[in-house]
Design a protein with these regions (language model features):
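Cleavable N-terminal signal peptides of Sec/SRP-targeted secreted and luminal proteins
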Residues: 3-18
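Primarily a LysM-type cell-wall glycan-binding module
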Residues: 17-41, 67, 73-97, 154
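Extracellular/cell-surface secretome signature
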Residues: 41, 97, 136-144
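Short, compositionally biased
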Residues: 82-90, 138-151
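Extracellular LysM carbohydrate-binding repeats and other cell-envelope/extracellular binding modules
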Residues: 20, 45-77, 102-138
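Acidic, Ser/Thr-rich intrinsically disordered and amphipathic helical segments
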Residues: 5, 33-36, 47, 62, ...
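A positional/structural detector of protein chain ends, strongest at the extreme C-terminus
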Residues: 3, 150-154
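Residue-level signal for mature regions of secreted extracellular proteins and peptides
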Residues: 11, 15, 27, 53, ...
Length: 154
């Protein structure tokens, strides 16, 4: 009984917990994933995970309908995004959006040096302006990346 009550209250609590400087937010609906929210609202998957690392777990499987998530924070809200598809490379993304190597990595610090950890469905910030993000939860990103990487082979 207590567990059911706690689960029912969780979305309400998460919507009450305000993230300092949150500039925009979204309400989770049934079937949402971190990547689908990112695509729907034009926010990078990295940024979504970063600003919600206190409420979204490592596999992004604890989203609850009615839960409010922050999409961006003041001065760190990239809204020019691209969704990775099969066979994408960082070089291709850079050329397509006219962004430098430094800017791509600055706006997507989770990408490794070889750019072999981007995954199909990941939403990247492709703005030509560089954003400086606070420290990110590398464990959360890696859990997302390695959860979806096998689909790159399809």
């Amino acid at each position: 009984m207590f567990v059911k009550l706690a689960l029912a209250v969780l979305p309400l609590l998460s919507s009450v917990l305000a993230i300092d400087g949150c500039t925009r937010n979204a309400t989770v609906v049934s079937g949402d994933t971190c990547d689908s929210i990112s695509r729907k609202y034009g926010v990078s998957t990295y940024q979504l995970a970063l600003v919600n690392d206190a409420t979204i777990d490592e596999n992004c499987d604890n989203l609850q309908p009615g839960q409010v998530v922050c999409l961006g924070i003041e001065e760190h809200d990239c809204t020019k995004v691209y969704t990775v598809v099969a066979d994408d490379t960082c070089d291709y993304i850079q050329q397509t959006y006219g962004i430098s190597n430094e800017t791509l990595w600055s706006n997507n610090p989770q990408i490794d040096d070889a750019c072999d950890n981007i995954y199909v469905g990941e939403v990247l910030c492709v703005d030509t302006e560089s954003y400086t993000y606070p420290q990110y939860n590398e464990t959360l990103y890696n859990a997302l990346a390695y959860t979806y990487l096998p689909y790159c082979d399809e």
